[in-house]
From Swiss-Prot:
Expressed in heart and pancreas, with lower expression in brain and muscle and almost no expression in placenta, lung, liver and kidney. Residues 177-221 form the DSL domain. InterPro entries: DSL, EGF-like_Ca-bd_dom, EGF-like_dom, EGF-type_Asp/Asn_hydroxyl_site, EGF_Ca-bd_CS, Growth_fac_rcpt_cys_sf, Notch_Cell-Fate_Det, Notch_ligand_N. Residues 226-254, 257-285, 292-325, 332-363, 370-402, 409-440, 447-478, 485-516 form the EGF-like domain. It is linked to Neurodevelopmental disorder with non-specific brain abnormalities and with or without seizures: An autosomal dominant disorder characterized by developmental delay, intellectual disability, seizures, autism spectrum disorder, behavioral abnormalities, and variable non-specific brain malformations. PROSITE patterns: ASX_HYDROXYL, DSL, EGF_1, EGF_2, EGF_3, EGF_CA. This is Delta-like protein 1. The lineage of its organism: Eukaryota, Metazoa, Chordata, Craniata, Vertebrata. Its main location: membrane. Residues 720-723 are annotated as: Interaction with MAGI1. Residues 1-17 form the signal peptide. Disulfide bonds join 179-188, 192-204, 212-221, 226-237, 230-243, 245-254, 257-268, 263-274, 276-285, 292-304, 298-314, 316-325, 332-343, 337-352, 354-363, 370-381, 375-391, 393-402, 409-420, 414-429, 431-440, 447-458, 452-467, 469-478, 485-496, 490-505, 507-516. Residues 653-702 are annotated as: Disordered. Homodimer. Interacts with TJP1. Interacts with MAGI1 (via PDZ domain); forms a complex with CTNNB1 and CDH2 and promotes recruitment to the adherens junction and stabilization on the cell surface. Interacts with PSEN1; undergoes a presenilin-dependent gamma-secretase cleavage that releases a Dll1-intracellular form. Interacts with MFAP5. Interacts with MIB1. Interacts with NEURL1B; leads to ubiquitination. Interacts with NEURL1. Interacts with SYNJ2BP; enhances DLL1 protein stability, and promotes Notch signaling in endothelial cells. Interacts with MAGI1, MAGI2, MAGI3 and MPDZ. The gene is DLL1.
Length: 723
């Protein structure tokens, strides 16, 4: 379980390291020369046009950005930018580290948080300032010189030197890109940090590869290397140098099986076997069968054969002889080596050590010299002081005599199916379509030419690309617009027509709008009516707002005319009505009272909203001084009070009620001539002149009450109506 967790963490660490790469671009300003002390516009740095001396207080603006075929000095500086303080006047040199001015560090460092692309564009501007505190770079009049270049740069510790000359100025500088600690590879994208713990036991190579510590192996160096010779199947180890045996095996290397218990003269190929040795038999191999097996008389690996009881023969191996093969044969006995060569006896063979000047199996050949021209294919021959010679082979050949041609393609250096061509002293990879580079290991960016049109997103493949189109476009390159009528934008049975990059709806009769979503009013036929459908079909232009507005205005005019006719008819009917009592003739009432009645000292009192509650229960309004308590008295004893608004001017009961009301509600002191004429009382007088016996009572809430209560004179029920 622990090893699995360690492996998972190591894999996660490797994935994260592939995403977060780290390195730094370093630019070292070494020397700047302004020969005449002039600005780029040939003016004196102090602003005048006169002759020198002109002292140019020089500072630099550095802009590092991505590779551009035509370098633009304008921002943004995608990789970083820096502005130095004033570093000198006219011509000066810059030491490493920036010198005494702590505000400037030389070299200038631009850290990278992503893989180094290998190319960059660099802009270095030398500018003049009158004050060390004014380091603005936007004024072109301050420019002394400008360097704008693009370069290819590989990762490494070595500095790339460069010199920029612009006629009057020279700038000497150097640059490099180095990886941060624990980062390796061509783009500083390989992360490797040495460790020696439960998660790995390794160091890092030059390219960031993991180099396992002694005794460890595996992708993350988490697997211990067991004791050399330890059987891989039958042994294991928890730490380097161990060899622990599995069940059924034994020995230092766990390569010996454990025999069946009780086996005496037997062996095993698998645990718990008992395979009898020659000359022995039985279940436990404890029964003697022959002499050869028991006594092993034959020596030096000879084969013993039982020829009878107690007898045997030995079959000797080459190089041995004797009854039991105990004697070795001396192959050097006939002295096979010639020309003074020394012989060495071997098993069933011999070898000759030749003196200087001779060679061959038995030293029978004399050595050649450079005079014999032994070197082939243009090799250069050199005589050895002890005799013989040596050949120095040209490029593309090897061997003692330069007789072998080197095949540079034998190691298969080309990747991705590329064909290797041997050029004699080098090789060339012919890449398949979609790949480039020396070894054809770079996938060509098919999206570099921006093949996707109309804002489509390009995804690179192998010799191919794909486009993710924005809404409204389709096709391999997003160049084909989606049919505008595809989603049926026209409503109410309209017909959709495509007109370039838009659509036009041919509306059915009676509908209008860009999508025929409006129902048009039916207008009388005439020359002023415009057929919107024909207009849309003929012109294919925008929505005919003029025609729609004209139709709406015409309908409004018709409605206004009808309203005017109704008003005139009502006015004419009112003129022909006979004169009537103002109160009887007024049909509009509020709180069940005519406007004129609300200002009289009326015989009906309105109870305020806070004094009465709408209910269908009977209430006693006839106690002692009930009229005074409740503040109201019946006005129309014999009239249906729900029909107050329907009373006519010629109703006799209404006239009697009015006369009775006038009699009862007249204030004291009024003359008989004023009988039947409504009298208006002020709010204060009404409250002061209230009489208990009068049966009339006024209320301050008379005019603006939402509930009007009418009581029968001899009935306990209360009728309430709400206006």
């Amino acid at each position: 379980m622990g090893s699995r967790c360690a492996l998972a963490l190591a894999v996660l660490s490797a994935l994260l390291c592939q995403v977060w790469s780290s390195g730094v671009f370093e630019l070292k300003l070494q020397e700047f020369v302004n020969k005449k002390g002039l600005l780029g516009n040939r003016n004196c740095c102090r602003g005048g046009a006169g002759p020198p001396p002109c002292a140019c207080r020089t500072f630099f603006r550095v802009c590092l950005k991505h590779y551009q075929a035509s370098v633009s000095p304008e921002p943004p500086c995608t990789y970083g930018s820096a502005v130095t303080p004033v570093l000198g006047v006219d011509s000066f040199s810059l030491p490493d580290g920036g010198g005494a001015d702590s505000a400037f560090s030389n070299p200038i460092r631009f850290p990278f948080g992503f893989t180094w692309p290998g190319t960059f564009s660099l802009i270095i501007e030398a500018l003049h300032t009158d004050s060390p505190d004014d380091l603005a770079t936007e004024n072109p009049e301050r420019l002394i010189s400008r360097l704008a270049t693009q370069r290819h740069l590989t990762v490494g510790e070595e500095w790339s030197q460069d010199l920029h000359s612009s006629g009057r100025t020279d700038l000497k500088y150097s640059y490099r890109f180095v990886c941060d600690e624990h980062y390796y590879g061509e783009g500083c994208s390989v992360f490797c940090r040495p460790r020696d713990d439960a998660f790995g036991h390794f160091t890092c190579g030059e390219r960031g590869e993991k180099v396992c510590n002694p005794g460890w192996k595996g992708p993350y160096c988490t697997e211990p290397i067991c004791l050399p010779g330890c059987d891989e199947q039958h042994g294991f180890c928890d730490k380097p140098g161990e060899c622990k045996c599995r069940v059924g095996w034994q020995g230092r290397y766990c390569d010996e099986c454990i025999r069946y218990p009780g086996c005496l003269h037997g062996t095993c190929q698998q645990p718990w076997q008992c395979n009898c040795q020659e000359g022995w038999g039985g279940l436990f191999c404890n029964q003697d069968l022959n002499y050869c097996t028991h006594h092993k008389p034959c020596k030096n690996g000879a084969t013993c054969t039982n020829t009878g009881q107690g007898s045997y023969t030995c079959s000797c191996r080459p190089g041995y002889t004797g009854a039991t093969c105990e004697l070795g044969i001396d192959e050097c006995d006939p002295s096979p080596c010639k020309n003074g060569g020394s012989c060495t006896d071997l098993e069933n063979s011999y070898s000759c050590t030749c003196p200087p000047g001779f060679y061959g199996k038995i030293c029978e050949l004399s050595a050649m010299t450079c005079a014999d021209g032994p070197c082939f294919n243009g090799g250069r021959c050199s005589d050895s002081p002890d005799g013989g010679y040596s050949c120095r082979c040209p490029v593309g050949y090897s061997g003692f005599n330069c007789e072998k041609k080197i095949d540079y393609c034998s190691s298969s250096p080309c990747s991705n199916g590329a064909k290797c061509v041997d050029l004699g002293d080098a090789y060339l990879c012919r890449c398949q379509a979609g790949f480039s580079g020396r070894h054809c290991d770079d996938n060509v960016d098919d999206c570099a030419s921006s093949p996707c049109a109309n804002g489509g997103t390009c995804r690179d493949g192998v010799n191919d690309f794909s486009c993710t189109c924005p809404p409204g476009y389709t096709g391999r390159n997003c160049s084909a617009p989606v049919s505008r009528c595809e989603h049926a934008p026209c409503h109410n049975g309209a017909t959709c027509h495509e007109r370039g990059h838009r659509y036009v709806c041919e509306c059915a009769r009676g509908y209008g709008g860009p999508n025929c979503q409006f129902l048009l009013p039916e207008l009388p036929p005439g020359p002023a009516v415009v057929d919107l459908t024909e207009k849309l079909e003929g012109q294919g232009g925008p929505f005919p707002w003029v025609a729609v507005c004209a139709g709406v205005i015409l309908v409004l005019m018709l409605l206004l005319g009808c309203a005017a006719v109704v008003v005139c008819v009502r006015l004419r009917l009112q003129k022909h009505r006979p004169p009537a009592d103002p109160c009887r003739g007024e049909t509009e009432t509020m709180n069940n009272l005519a406007n004129c009645q609300r200002e009289k000292d009326i015989s009906v009192s309105i109870i305020g909203a806070t004094q009465i509650k709408n209910t269908n229960k009977k209430a006693d309004f006839h106690g002692d001084h009930s009229a005074d308590k409740n503040g109201f008295k019946a006005r129309y004893p014999a009239v249906d009070y729900n029909l107050v608004q329907d009373l006519k001017g010629d109703d006799t009961a209404v006239r009697d009620a009015h006369s009775k009301r006038d009699t009862k509600c007249q204030p004291q002191g009024s003359s008989g001539e004023e009988k039947g004429t409504p009298t208006t009382l002020r709010g204060g007088e009404a409250s002061e002149r209230k009489r208990p016996d009068s049966g009339c009572s006024t209320s301050k809430d008379t005019k603006y009450q939402s509930v009007y209560v009418i009581s029968e004179e001899k009935d306990e029920c209360v009728i309430a109506t709400e206006v």
